[in-house]
Amino acid sequence: MGARVIDGRPIAGELKKRVASEVEGLAARGVRPGLATVLVGEDYAARAYERRVGGLAAELGCRYVCERLPREAEEADVLAVVGKLNADPRVSGILVLRPLPGHISEPAVFSALDPLKDIEAVHPVNAGLLALGRPRYVPSTPAACFYLLDRYLERSGRPPEEFYPRSTVVVVGRSNNVGKPAVSLGFARGAAVISCDANAYRAGRLREHTLKADALIVAAGVAGLIDESYVREGVIAVDVGINPVADPGGSGRTLLVGDLDFGSVARKAEALTPVPGGVGPITDVWLLKNTVAAGRGLASQAKARCLLRGSHAHSSLI
């Protein structure tokens, strides 16, 4: 029996219905969440992601704006855009699309975000809360990985709360937006977690680590990095890679492939995710889920401030 292919699209569809219901509930209270993206330059993957989330925001009834800057923009220009979005009451969530050009400091830009609008938890405060197990927002891609894993486990008759404490989760890649948060989420579920990156590969030890995985999350950004020699029989493999490559058939088209050598890994895996159509659709919806949560929180804060001002005005008349 071959490996099962975990299609993320129906899982994303179920999640989207829940998010749409939340948007409707907020609309009944006069609240409309708003997502803003900041795109610097013309990176292929970033532009594709911006188009997807913009379309999804419109579909769900959220406000959406993309602030586009040329690759030559100065860091001060990006910080000015972030400051403008921080102050805009119509914007509840801000996503700075990566990669940023090399002359712009990611830490400086991320630190400038309003933590309440930082829906990818890249601000130091939000990253710290996530590491402590008390996240304000869970970043969309690692959240999507575990949401997909949880749904797959449930549907195959294994409660996640029983699976993880008995299992080893291996995360390949240590990026701030995927690898490191995925490690935190694995620990939060009680799993033994192994984190490895390019250093393990250069030292010739990557295979040693990945062969221990009951669940393998690969977010290295290297097309076809993991083949069947890197995985044990029965692994559940989640591919986060989105690598644009030229069509080997010579059509001139650009194709997206993952970090798994899909056909090879499928010979040994219990289940694995495709690229595209695996983690990606869930990631998109989760970003809007965080945007809606941010909108709800900001609306509650605004209401509390109004009540407080009313209380002060009343007391001044007594």
From Swiss-Prot:
Q: What is its EC number?
A: 1.5.1.5, 3.5.4.9
Q: Where does NADP(+) bind?
A: 173-175, 242
Is Cell wall biogenesis/degradation set as a keyword in this record?
no
Kindly tell me the pathway this chain contributes to: One-carbon metabolism; tetrahydrofolate interconversion
A GO molecular function held by the record: methylenetetrahydrofolate dehydrogenase (NADP+) activity
Q: Which UniProt keywords apply?
A: Amino-acid biosynthesis, Histidine biosynthesis, Hydrolase, Methionine biosynthesis, Multifunctional enzyme, NADP, One-carbon metabolism, Oxidoreductase, Purine biosynthesis
Q: Which GO terms describe its biological process?
A: L-histidine biosynthetic process; methionine biosynthetic process; purine nucleotide biosynthetic process; tetrahydrofolate interconversion
Q: Which domain of life is it from?
A: Bacteria
Catalyses: (6R)-5,10-methylene-5,6,7,8-tetrahydrofolate + NADP(+) = (6R)-5,10-methenyltetrahydrofolate + NADPH; (6R)-5,10-methenyltetrahydrofolate + H2O = (6R)-10-formyltetrahydrofolate + H(+)
Q: Hydrolase: is it a keyword of this entry?
A: yes
Which GO CC annotations does the UniProt entry carry? cytosol
Q: How does it assemble?
A: Homodimer.
Q: What protein family does this chain belong to?
A: Belongs to the tetrahydrofolate dehydrogenase/cyclohydrolase family.
Q: State what this protein does.
A: Catalyzes the oxidation of 5,10-methylenetetrahydrofolate to 5,10-methenyltetrahydrofolate and then the hydrolysis of 5,10-methenyltetrahydrofolate to 10-formyltetrahydrofolate.
Q: What name does the UniProt record give this protein?
A: Bifunctional protein FolD 3
